């Protein structure tokens, strides 16, 4: 398993991380024996980053991950969790953040995590359940730093969802160590310019900003919430199709566009669409680790097999770029 140094943290993190989210659902709603089997297999092949959040199953993901790690006692496991601050707590961010992490640590059975990510979307002016860049830098950061000084988290992170200008501002402030970034075959604008008229949010080459600031990148929505699996079928324990992040305005449109990328399979570049999506995500050097949702140990094995084949060859990336140009001019 390839490892990459995660930004300025100097942590050697496996390029494939273990996602404990609610979309795939294994660590939220899976059978305990399947959870243990998948985590044990991940550790066996050298996966060392585990990503969870209190929002995943209202704490179930953290609890289940904590149980399994306590049983398996890995020599090295980096754990990241998150806090989503509700609007009613925007007037007490310091306390809300501290209380959330304390709850997470209790569920995980740990005295600290390696990365503590803000889960809220970040916008220029805030509003609703989003935080403004100003709120993040002036209120969230000091609260996070207090927890860092107390030893409850080693590093600070954001979820890079929201308005592009605000995300650039927060990354450029050089105070966060990690950013979870949506990056997939339907929207690669974190890495490259979007063609004019392309129907997706333009992340404005966010990777240029993370690399300059020494921010490690966790790739999320690698399979676009399931759209890039190439099938409408979802495992019984998986979540319903989630709202897209950064790509189309609805999941059905993402599904339709994903089907138009199938020439990658038919022309022999890859064995399957999810393989293409997974290998695409690790093809950029700014990527520190990627998270692929899973409902079963078998789905984990499929993601693992794809990563072990390595990044997509340049010919496949060129073919993908040509296919994606077909989306230009369509409504988002």
Language model segments and positions:
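N-terminal binding-site loop/beta-alpha segment at the start of enzyme catalytic domains
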Residues: 1-77
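Conserved, mostly hydrophobic/aromatic
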Residues: 6, 18, 50, 65, ...
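Acidic (Asp/Glu)-rich catalytic clusters
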Residues: 8-10, 66-76, 105-111, 170-174, ...
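Acidic-and-aromatic substrate-binding clefts and catalytic sites of carbohydrate-active enzymes
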Residues: 26-30, 53-62, 86-95, 123-125, ...
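Short, acidic/polar
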Residues: 29-42, 92-107, 162-170, 277
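Alpha-helix-loop-beta-strand connector modules within alpha/beta enzyme cores
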Residues: 63-81, 137-150
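Active-site groove signature of glycoside hydrolases
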Residues: 105-130
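Beta/alpha (TIM)-barrel catalytic core signal, keyed to glycine-rich beta->alpha loops juxtaposed to Asp/Glu
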Residues: 121-331
């Amino acid at each position: 398993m390839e490892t990459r140094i995660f930004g300025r943290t100097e942590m050697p993190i496996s390029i494939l991380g273990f996602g404990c989210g609610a979309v795939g659902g294994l660590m939220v709603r899976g059978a305990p024996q399947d959870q243990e089997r998948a985590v044990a297999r991940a550790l066996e092949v050298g996966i060392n980053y585990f990503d969870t959040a209190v929002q995943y199953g209202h704490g179930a993901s953290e609890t289940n991950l904590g149980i399994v790690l306590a049983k398996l006692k890995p020599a090295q496991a980096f754990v990241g969790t998150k806090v989503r601050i509700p609007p009613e707590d925007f007037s007490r961010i310091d306390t809300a953040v501290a209380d959330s992490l304390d709850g997470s640590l209790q569920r995980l059975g740990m005295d600290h995590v390696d990365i503590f990510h803000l889960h809220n979307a970040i916008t220029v002016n805030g509003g609703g359940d989003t935080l403004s860049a100003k709120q993040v830098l002036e209120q969230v950061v000091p609260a996070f730093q207090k927890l860092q000084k107390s030893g409850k988290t080693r590093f600070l992170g954001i979820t890079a969802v929201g308005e592009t200008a605000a995300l650039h501002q927060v990354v450029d402030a050089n105070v966060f160590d990690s950013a979870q970034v949506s990056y997939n075959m339907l929207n690669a604008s974190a890495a490259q310019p979007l063609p004019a008229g392309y129907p997706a949010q333009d992340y404005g080459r966010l990777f240029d900003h993370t690399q300059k600031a020494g921010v490690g990148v966790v790739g999320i929505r690698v399979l676009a919430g399931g759209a890039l699996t190439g099938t409408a079928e979802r495992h019984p324990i998986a979540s319903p199709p989630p709202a897209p992040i950064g790509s189309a305005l609805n999941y059905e449109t993402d599904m339709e566009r994903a089907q138009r990328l199938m020439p990658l399979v038919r022309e022999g570049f890859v064995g399957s669409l999810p393989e293409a999506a997974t290998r695409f995500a690790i093809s950029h050097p700014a990527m520190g680790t990627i998270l692929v949702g899973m409902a079963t140990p078998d789905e984990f094995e499929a993601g693992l097999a794809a990563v072990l084949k390595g990044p997509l060859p340049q010919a496949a990336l060129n073919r993908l770029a040509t296919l994606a140009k077909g989306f230009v001019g369509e409504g988002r």
